[in-house]
């Protein structure tokens, strides 16, 4: 691929980014778009501000960048939770390591590659991208020691940064456990596969079992019922309530001037009446009473939440095998109430292993089916073969600009469009597996999307050709390093264009929120719906973490092979830090989280990227007949594997299990302070399948908001006119208390 094609792709994507970021800085200042760009603040109780019409509202400004840059990590932790902090630390790690990599490789490796062979160089924009790769070095070149030394520096810096980040995040996770002393999940165990007995109900069987074997620690239990229809009806009713409760009777319930021809009712009065929001028509009823009126023993499922006196008791029960039959009395630590995926608790436990195998087969089959569009896309980068296959295209492809667009821009755009179908499908597969919580489902989807992305974007593209070739390329294990070494330099141009489109342009689309903006416009203009209640989104970790890791993989593998990509990746990571931080603070709401469990995924994938880079470099040193560089690369691979194993032994268990020492100290502190009895009283009503306001389960109550004691400032710090009571009434907004899950992006 020529540099001119890369410049064309870069110019198109830079223009898209500038236009979208400028539009965002204008649209976010419009009062009608507050529910799109400030959904999190509004839901968490921020007051809507009235902005008079003036010129500054229609002028782009970088104030949101300044705000995102100035927000500290402590403020972010209080506002969005540990997962958001861990994600941004992933971005910060990427900025740090690739700054080091870019300085080393651009300063030393790139000049060695460019002047690797005696040749007459053209102007830069007419050069081929392969001139800047290690492919340009001649066999037996003595300059390959520069690449080997750079590889050692990159690996050492990456491992050092990974160690400090792993240590810091492990401490943050322990602080997250101790800082949430009132979490009911720490006292609760989820029991599945309760044995069925024709003589008694599941509830009686469970009560008898735990009274017999855990009489000193067992408190009570809450059965899981098959009341999905009731849940849906109540959820719909609650959403309708949230829609109506923001309606002001004085404004929206004016007498109708049009006679009613259907019901014969009065035409000059309004029959619409808003009830008070006290207990929401269930005042005076206990949660258990309402549950028993809608559920019976026939609707009980073989799953329940069991509550214990101390956190340590719950931990022991969750880790111990309860029966000689491992398929009965299966125990897990319960997820948080708003993290429970109730639908999957109805699945019989004996079906789970079949579901996991089926979803694995489905995911692998989809990965291979995806070879078809990827192979077609790679054909677009090979114009010579394309013109031979389709002779009628030779005239069009002979035009320089069209040639540059097809080779430098179109393939990556088509690949991204195909990839939009991947995250929803992987989320569906993860739900079919039977995950007990939404956070586990999202983590599982994240891993699936990560594998899918690395396989199709990296391996399938660098080993481009027919589908048959994809299956035969790894026929010999010894050929893998050499095959990868030959293929990576040829795809360096494609990876750079993919960085432009999937990186820069995708970030600009992320901050614009085009789907939410269009939906808001349709609701206000087409349907004339002025309701400002907004169903907020959850941060899509299952799509953004794989994208981040993919670019890290591309950066490491191309660092000593084709370092021209590094400055563009560094720009992407810096933009990602500002844009994601802005979105987390203003748009996305945290209703549940994993407690930092995404970091081991990031750590392990980064180690994989380093080892893959070393294997590719080893293959290239072999192709270039440099035995010294090859000999020094093998110990580096072994040292990286040893470092990975040390981190797995030292830090990984903290992310898989809760330490008993910490939980016992928390139990003792609660017993001394007298809080334990109060916690026991709250346990039973927390894990209810029926959503009630009396449960205090609203997103407004659960999201911590560092701005809650302040009025929500205008994005440009514009002050409203004093004493404009009518405007405040018109633009007043109270947060949506339901905070229901937006499944399309959760």
Swiss-Prot record:
Alphabetic keyword roster: Calcium, Ion channel, Ion transport, Membrane, Transmembrane, Transmembrane helix, Transport
GO MF annotation list: calcium-activated cation channel activity
Pfam families referenced in this protein's UniProt entry, alphabetically: PHM7_cyt, RSN1_7TM, RSN1_TM
Cellular location(s): Membrane
Keyword Membrane appears in the UniProt entry: yes
GO CC terms: membrane
Transmembrane spans: 3-23, 90-110, 144-164, 357-377, 405-425, 445-465, 492-512, 560-580, 601-621, 623-643
Biased composition (Basic and acidic residues): 708-723
Keyword Oxidoreductase set for record: no
Region (Disordered): 692-723
Membrane topology: Multi-pass membrane protein
Biased composition (Polar residues): 692-702
Its job: Acts as an osmosensitive calcium-permeable cation channel.
Family: Belongs to the CSC1 (TC 1.A.17) family.
Name this polypeptide is given: Hyperosmolality-gated Ca2+ permeable channel 2.1
Organism: Arabidopsis thaliana (Mouse-ear cress)
Lineage of producing organism: Eukaryota, Viridiplantae, Streptophyta, Embryophyta, Tracheophyta
